[in-house]
Regions:
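Membrane-embedded segments
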Residues: 1-60, 69, 87
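Short alpha-helix in the alpha/beta-hydrolase fold that links the catalytic acid
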Residues: 19, 127, 136, 150-159
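Primarily recognizes the serine-hydrolase "nucleophile elbow" in alpha/beta-hydrolase
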Residues: 60-64, 68-112
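Mobile cap/lid helix-loop segments that gate and shape the active-site cleft of serine hydrolases
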Residues: 100-136
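Short beta-strand/loop motif that positions the catalytic acidic residue
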Residues: 133-135, 140-146
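Acidic catalytic loop of the alpha/beta-hydrolase fold
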Residues: 145-149, 175-177
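Catalytic histidine neighborhood in serine/cysteine hydrolases
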Residues: 155-176
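Post-His helix in hydrolase/transferase enzymes
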Residues: 178-193
Length: 194
């Protein structure tokens, strides 16, 4: 199996090295891509382009002999919206969402409650509307102390998602999960099950 890691908005690929090192302990292949305009890449990181980047990564893996049904989509924060979008094909092995939001509009309303964000935001990432279309197994992980994307958003997606599904609320973590041994074991058990 191969994890396709779709990273979040802040930082760069190096900032995910501790997660990738932990995932490497599971004896899986891991491919992480850098979005347009991240880590020195050119281009505009809009919703359509990020979906396209992820689809190209899937095609690249397919061209290297990795079947789609052996790919685990792993979305982190911003990347969760991309994972939900392309996961609707239901061809993937499973999907893991770390610190997901219900939609970019609802997440933005938390920070800008008096602005008409629905009309100002071009990129919507409406996972709340799309996740019901996914039939593959889903693991949703969220830190209880997340002050960027509230944990209730992950719980809401879990409620809407089809079975099989699992929700992990990590009591001591915030937006970026610590990837301790307990969390790694939960991820391993989920991956081994499917």
């Amino acid at each position: 199996k191969t994890i396709l890691f779709l990273h979040g908005n802040a930082g760069n690929l190096f900032n995910r090295s501790y997660k990738l090192n932990r995932l490497n302990e599971l004896n899986l292949n891991v491919l992480i891509i850098s979005w347009r305009s991240f880590s020195g890449n050119l281009g505009k990181p809009n919703e359509t382009n990020l979906y396209g980047d992820a689809k190209k990564a899937v095609k690249w893996l397919n061209d290297k002999g990795v079947k789609t049904e052996n790919i685990i989509l792993y979305g982190e924060s911003l990347g969760t919206g991309v994972a939900v979008e392309i996961g609707q094909t239901n061809k993937f092995n499973s999907i893991i969402l770390e610190s997901p939001y219900t939609s970019m509009i609802k997440a933005a309303k938390i920070y800008y409650p008096y602005l008409p964000v629905k009309f100002l935001l071009k990129d919507k990432y409406e996972s709340e509307k799309k996740i019901k279309n996914i039939k593959t197994p889903i693991l949703i992980m969220h830190g209880k102390k997340d002050d960027i994307v509230p944990c209730y958003m992950g719980k809401k997606l879990f409620e809407i998602a089809n079975k099989p599904k699992k929700f992990l609320q990590i009591e001591e973590d915030d937006h970026m999960l610590s990837f301790n041994d307990n969390l790694l074991l939960e991820i391993q058990n989920f991956i081994n099950k499917y």
